[in-house]
Amino acid sequence: MAKAKFERTKPHVNIGTIGHVDHGKTTLTAAITTVLAKQGKAEAKAYDQIDAAPEERERGITISTAHVEYETDARHYAHVDCPGHADYVKNMITGAAQMDGAILVVSAADGPMPQTREHILLSRQVGVPYIVVFLNKCDMVDDEELLELVEMEVRDLLSEYDFPGDEVPVIKGSALKALEGDPQWEEKIIELMNAVDEYIPTPQREVDKPFMMPIEDVFSITGRGTVATGRVERGTLKVGDPVEIIGLSDEPKTTTVTGVEMFRKLLDQAEAGDNIGALLRGVSRDEVERGQVLAKPGSITPHTKFKAQVYVLTKEEGGRHTPFFSNYRPQFYFRTTDVTGIITLPEGVEMVMPGDNVEMTVELIAPIAIEEGTKFSIREGGRTVGAGSVSEIIE
């Protein structure tokens, strides 16, 4: 039988399974594909196929991630599942797998555990906007009251991290029983996917967001002016649009785009994903540099001080061999450039060991265009020693 081709006509959403080790994330992922495969909407994947996730490198960090895809009547999904806890932490902080929503798997037999809390906290800090709960292993719990107790605990935990605990859909099921083909539990997988369809909104597409392009290179064309090149990160740009040049200087500079080129051809409009050159009116060669961004005026602002959630590479990953302390001054690599910054660790945290993840405050020596969710690397002498995600802007 020929492989079915996924139709790209449906809206696309990125999701993933999160939760404590052994609560059934991978079994649930397998169950979703298996149940949907019976309706011809997925290719069934066995537990072992998902569990043997290939290693990928993102910002110099090795992460094991399994990717599966499937669809419902409403949407097309790309779903990530990580075998190990450390893989989740790295994945979420580097943004290697950007999630529009997550399915939090909690074993009804055990209730919320430390990594349940940690994954909810990470979701909050790296900007996973919506969570749907799957209470797993319900076939092992005879006591209805116990199920309700676990559900309440999970809802309280979500509320603690500013998710709407009262509104979050909670589906009670058994991934293993569904995987084994028990119709009563297969129905719960359908129920879960309906909740995901309805509760997790279709994300705004990158092209619909305000324009932004990190500047990679700058050159001047005699008689025409200054050109900034880079890959459009989001939004669209056309000739005549006003843009701001933001970062590395105290005040953003506003200018107008007088030409947009791609592969040396003139373009009416550039959009997210395009590599372009933008001709800037009245801007001299020394007023623009790599590391700045071009953006729709007022859409993003330069900052020097922020809080961030950071994963520190282990020695084996090529990171530091020794811990670091407050006042550590590495380079912070944002998009296209390094800026020195000073780290302040939270109260009660003396030092950070390779392999840890920690929230820290960073003060940069020059302003950079950042917002909540902006990703960065921490570098020392050109090698990556950490990866982070901005969780809060201070100034």
UniProtKB/Swiss-Prot annotation:
It is found in: Cytoplasm. Mg(2+) binds at T26. Pfam families: GTP_EFTU, GTP_EFTU_D2, GTP_EFTU_D3. Keywords: Cytoplasm, Elongation factor, GTP-binding, Hydrolase, Magnesium, Metal-binding, Nucleotide-binding, Protein biosynthesis. Residues 60-64 are annotated as: G2. Belongs to the TRAFAC class translation factor GTPase superfamily. Classic translation factor GTPase family. EF-Tu/EF-1A subfamily. Residues 19-26 are annotated as: G1. Its EC number is 3.6.5.3. This is Elongation factor Tu. Residues 174-176 are annotated as: G5.
